[in-house]
């Protein structure tokens, strides 16, 4: 079947997989927010059981264990959906031996996942990494070949699952940061599949020349703002996976200063202040829910270090830069393309997401890092990155003329200039 043929059900299934991935990222964020990542200490088994056969009474309703095990199960489901998309794409876009080999390869990897040993999963992750790299090369040569996008997504989900498991067994924060970052990239790839398989994408006009694209200034703003958001999410993931609690708990200042000192004497004071605040909150019954489970994570037992404060402050500064850049993108897009243009609407949505995201970040600080708000902060961060990425893709590939209002205003300006001359 042609690469350009449209399948409504394939598109719907891809959208469903994107929604499940978004939920999965939220579940992963909750695991980290509640410091629950090591409540199930083994992998790929769970308390010695096959992960899918863990008795319900060992994880349902148990704080921390429920979040971690549910995250593992949801990740497996997303992996299965991604495998389904890969099989579907290869069945549609290839023929004869190529189709058979590709589908057989996916089915073999699914079968090998039944061998629940860490060595097997690591070997599969290495092979999947090579296949992901090969898929990228094929995508560069033919961006419309969705079978290779699907292969990339399936390869990534295998690597992502193994990284999540190794984070448990190797106890390395760096793996956690990589795991969180790759999740965002995987979400973008999967959403690209959903976008490229949509009827709108098939029927909209592809840009033949640079002149038929959105103005360069609009494309650049979408791209660089998205890149900055991606770097911001890496900063955020690094902060979360330090498992150091909240190094600063006031806003807009930080420890009463615009840029807090990180001298040893001041660090000692910050730690003493945080301990006193934690004790006060505990005395006021603000740290635990009625079941005795923690609700805020002001401290995790680790002392505040200079690197924790520096990272926190850089995160604040980058947030301001993102807000300014996305605001500029919205203004420029409206001026260049008109208020009714698709990219103008998308830029307004993007700005709204950034404002909500900034508000959630502030509340995370002022409310002493409650798990629910911190998790929402992760989710809106993913949505913000995804919106920027889709704006970047659309602005650099579709021929979407400016709205009539924008063209008319530009013509009026030209007429006035000619009359004045």
Model-based region annotation:
Residues 1-9, 95-98, 102-108, 140, ...:
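Membrane-interfacial, low-structure loops and terminal tails that flank and connect transmembrane helices
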Residues 10-37, 228-240:
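N-terminal signal-anchor transmembrane alpha helix
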Residues 31-40, 117-123, 158-181, 239-250, ...:
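Interfacial helix-loop-helix junctions of multi-pass membrane proteins
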Residues 66-81, 115-127, 174-187, 310-328, ...:
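Membrane-interface loop-to-helix entry segments
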Residues 91-144:
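Transmembrane alpha-helices
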Residues 92-101, 135-151, 330-350:
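Membrane-interface helix-loop-helix junctions at transmembrane boundaries of multi-pass membrane enzymes
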């Amino acid at each position: 079947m042609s690469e350009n043929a449209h399948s409504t059900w394939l598109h719907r299934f891809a959208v469903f997989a994107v929604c499940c991935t978004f939920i999965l990222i939220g579940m992963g964020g909750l695991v980290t927010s509640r410091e629950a990542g090591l409540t199930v200490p083994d992998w790929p088994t769970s308390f010695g059981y096959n992960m899918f056969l863990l008795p319900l009474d060992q994880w349902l309703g148990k704080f921390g264990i429920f979040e971690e095990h549910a995250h593992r199960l949801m990740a497996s489901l997303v992996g299965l959906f991604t495998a389904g998309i890969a099989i579907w794409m290869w069945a549609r876009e290839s023929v004869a031996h190529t189709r058979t080999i590709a589908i057989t390869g996916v089915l073999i990897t699914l079968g090998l996942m039944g061998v629940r040993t860490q060595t097997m999963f690591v070997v599969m992750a290495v092979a999947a990494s090579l296949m992901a790299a090969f898929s990228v090369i094929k995508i560069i040569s033919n961006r419309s070949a969705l079978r290779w996008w699907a292969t990339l997504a399936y390869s990534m989900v295998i690597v992502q699952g193994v990284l999540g498991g190794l984070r448990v067994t190797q106890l390395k924060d760096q793996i956690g940061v990589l795991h969180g970052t790759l999740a965002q990239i995987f979400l973008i790839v999967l959403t690209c599949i959903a976008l490229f398989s949509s009827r709108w994408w098939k029927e909209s006009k592809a840009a033949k020349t640079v002149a038929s694209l959105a103005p360069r200034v609009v494309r650049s703003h979408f791209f660089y703002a998205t890149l900055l958001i991606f770097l911001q999410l890496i900063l955020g993931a690094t902060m979360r996976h330090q498992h150091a609690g909240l190094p600063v708990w006031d806003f807009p200042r930080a420890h009463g200063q615009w840029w807090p000192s990180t001298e040893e004497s001041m660090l000692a004071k910050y730690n003493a202040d945080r301990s006193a605040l934690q004790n006060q909150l505990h005395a006021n019954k603000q740290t635990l829910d009625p079941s005795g489970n923690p609700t805020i994570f002001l401290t995790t037992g680790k002392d505040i270090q200079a690197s924790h404060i520096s990272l926190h402050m850089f995160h604040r500064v980058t947030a301001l830069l993102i807000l300014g850049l996305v605001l500029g993108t919205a203004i420029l897009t409206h001026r260049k393309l008109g208020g009714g243009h698709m990219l103008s609407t998308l830029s307004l949505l993007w700005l709204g997401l950034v404002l909500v995201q900034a508000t959630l970040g502030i509340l995370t600080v002022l409310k002493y890092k409650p798990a629910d708000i911190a998790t929402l902060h992760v989710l809106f961060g993913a949505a913000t990155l995804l919106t920027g990425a889709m704006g970047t893709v659309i602005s650099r590939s579709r021929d979407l003329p400016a709205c009539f209002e924008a063209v008319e205003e530009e013509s009026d300006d030209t007429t006035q200039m000619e009359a004045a001359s």
